[in-house]
Regions:
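Active-site segment of SDR-like NAD(P)-dependent oxidoreductases
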Residues: 15-17, 56-60, 74, 106-109
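Conserved cofactor-binding/catalytic machinery of classical short-chain dehydrogenase/reductase
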Residues: 9, 34-37, 49, 72, ...
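SDR active-site strand-loop-helix element
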Residues: 10-14, 50-56, 103-105
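NAD(P)-dependent short-chain dehydrogenase/reductase
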Residues: 95-143, 148, 157
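NAD(P)H-binding glycine-rich loop region in Rossmannoid oxidoreductase-like domains
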Residues: 1-30, 41, 59
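Conserved Rossmann-fold NAD(P)-dependent oxidoreductase catalytic core, especially the SDR/UDP-sugar
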Residues: 36-79
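Catalytic helix-loop patch of NAD(P)-dependent Rossmann-fold dehydrogenases
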Residues: 29, 33, 64-109, 113
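Mid/C-terminal beta-alpha module of Rossmann-like enzyme folds, strongest
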Residues: 154-209
Length: 209
């Protein structure tokens, strides 16, 4: 890379995540040690700004009526969130090396639905199975979704505006809001079946032991 003039920007997207909520050595090896390795590489090639892909999931779910913003601390207490917090701390520890941007991303999906939970939801709701109409609780649980093309535009804008950004900044790559599961259910089933399909809301005591 140095032989070809170095690199103005380093975009660190690599990371490990699974849906078990259990600890895994890859969180430390990939998300923490891997970030440390990329930071050292970025210093060697003289980057103008380091862009670190963190996640809104590093922050605790906000209370009703509250939102997550750029000042929200990354204090969620499950393995993936803890590893992202450690990554953010590494960025802060190395800020004297080069300017950096911590980008906390929403749930990223594509036209191919390459976000596993979203795929499972839509695949279930559009199938002819006993549970295809079931939603947990009142369907008010929600996730902020962002299309991968919008994420690309976001990163390009950060690069374009790099000289006007603080040396170290935290940015949320997310819509200004969220999509509830009941909203998602209604949209997906109406589009697929061409009509409204009534959902079945599962009571809390049937879900929580």
């Amino acid at each position: 890379i140095l032989e070809h003039g170095g690199a103005d920007f380093v975009l660190h997207l690599a990371g490990y995540y699974d849906f078990t909520n259990e600890d895994n050595e890859e969180y430390q090896r990939t998300n923490v040690q891997g970030t440390r390795n990329i930071l050292k590489l970025a210093k060697q090639i003289g980057t103008r700004r380091f862009l670190f892909a963190s996640s809104l999931a590093a922050c605790k779910f906000p209370a009703r009526g509250k939102t997550i913003d750029e000042s929200s601390p990354p204090v969620a207490q499950y393995p993936y969130a803890i590893s992202k917090r450690a990554g953010e701390e590494l960025i802060k520890e190395h800020q004297e090396w080069f300017p950096s941007a911590i980008v906390r991303m929403a749930a990223i999906y594509s036209d191919w639905c390459e976000y596993p939970p979203l795929y499972v939801f839509i695949n279930t709701w559009t199938a002819s199975k006993w549970n295809s109409r079931v939603l947990g609780g009142r369907g008010h649980s929600a996730v902020p979704y962002l299309h991968v093309q919008d994420l690309i535009r976001f990163f390009l804008k950060v690069i374009e505006k790099t000289d006007s950004l603080p040396r170290l900044c935290t940015l949320n790559a997310s819509p200004n809001g969220f999509t509830t599961h009941i909203e998602l259910y209604k949209t997906a089933t109406r589009y697929f079946f061409g009509r409204d399909v009534r959902s079945l809301l599962m009571l809390r005591f049937l879900v929580v032991p």
